[in-house]
Amino acid sequence: MTREKMWTTRREAMALLSGAVAGVAFGGDVRAQGTPKRGGILRISAPTNPSSLDPATGGAGSDHAFLFTMYDTLTEWDFETLKPKPGLAESWSFSDPTTFVLNIRPGVTFHDGTPLDAEAVKFNLERNKSDPKSNIKADLATMASASVTGPMQVTLKLNALDAALPGILSDRAGMMVSPTALKASAAGNVARTPVGAGAYTFVSWADGEKIVIKRNEKYWKPNRPYPDGIEFAIIPELTTGVRSVTAGQNDLIYQLPPRQKVVVERSKDLKVFNGPTLYVFQIFLNWAKPPFDDIRVRKAFNMAIDRESFVKAALAGLAEPAYMNLPKSHWAYDKSVAALTPYDPAQARKLLAEANFKEGTTIDLVGYPDQDSVQRQEILIEQLRKAGISVRFLNAPIAEASAAFFGAEKRGSGLLAAWTGRPDPSLTYSLMFTKDAYYNGGRGAVPPELEAAIKESRASEDVQIRTKAFATVQRLVMENAFVAPLAFQFELVAMNKKVQGYRPNLLGKPKYDDVWLES
């Protein structure tokens, strides 16, 4: 099967989801009106402080909103289908099943003037794969070696065919960092001083307050970007963020909770986009330590959650209940897996009794302190209580909470957060459900057949073969109750009417490729 045929089939299989994103389900005008103009500062209300501005070392999906502005990727994803398309690599091919060739776009430089050539790409890929600080090793698990086979060509030898690789390189693993900047850093990373090859260059970061970037005047895409710069105001309380946009202090706010939809639609000066995404609220579980080291407790925990009620109470009905990590309209979704996690508090109590889990025992979960997160926590606390499960939330800002749960501290037994989706579903599963994956919070053991199925999902370009493999992956994840998925939230973005050219996307991660400001 050719690559084009594979993606045609995928588009058909994703018709409902991508069709909605193409315009039907989104409020507002998806395409820009008028002739784009250069100039102005785009002011954005951002709900989170980044965990890191180094794509290899960050640990929060919310980082992408910042990373995509400063780092270009080897491939890019199509906004409507997530099909990979040329980026810093102007073309790629599998010369044989285990040889992947990247042809790098000539004439591109990093922000510090370092050439973005084959040597730079090789350096980045090897760092992402092998550096102890890298949190994205699993992305490049199939890469055995990288070699320079021409001034602008890199050849990867793979330990198995990896059909997902073009899509993987449109995410963190494909974000290119200046080797010069990395080698000059005593810490071995650019977490606070990012140097990429993206549309904007870094200016400053006042932690928890503001991030400022300016136009890259040597950017390789003609006439891009349009704004002179972007200022991100870090405003965790979304009610405050909305007020900043309605008052004109900021121009755009993203990742709005559904309860804000009525508020922003009421403003005559704002336009609103909303539609489905792969963004899923979930509770990450540490199954390497009590009580979730017992599969019966994990299953009981899942059965104690009424997802339909959660969507109505926490998300104003603007979401899809989640019974696995893919929504119903995704091409790899397997409806039989949804039946593995019914709402059944009586059966949950029975499983807890079998596990000798004493009612009243408190499970510590990590969470976030903002108003909407706390509301979600309160709903879950009450639902779990009905099944005899008591939970306590240890709240901290997103970057701190994520590092505490996934990092060395291993704080809490679970983390109420979100998985922001990936261009290829194999990334979602390999990053959470393989033994050494960063988002496997306790680095807990997984069944060999699960790791084998994840590998199989990447071993063919035939979408039917991949779909069958993903059915096995989804079944094994939920049979083992390694995660407690809750709901797929719709993207909700509000902006001043002077903001033109914004395009929503399936990942729900904002990109500003075509954004310009009316004067």
Regions found by a protein language model. Name each.
Residues 45-96, 126, 193-196:
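N-terminal lobe/hinge region of extracytoplasmic solute-binding protein
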Residues 217-263, 390:
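Ligand-site clamp/hinge motif
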Residues 44, 113, 383-433, 469:
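Periplasmic binding protein-like
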Residues 117-124, 151-155, 198-199, 226-229, ...:
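Alpha-helical secondary-structure segments
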Residues 320-354, 372-375:
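Structural transition elements
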Residues 372, 392-402, 428-497, 519:
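Extracytoplasmic/peripheral linker and loop segments enriched in polar/acidic and small residues
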Residues 78-83, 171-225, 229, 346, ...:
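Gly/Pro-rich hinge or "lid" segments in bacterial periplasmic/extracellular proteins
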Residues 93, 138-182, 204:
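Surface-exposed binding/hinge segments that line
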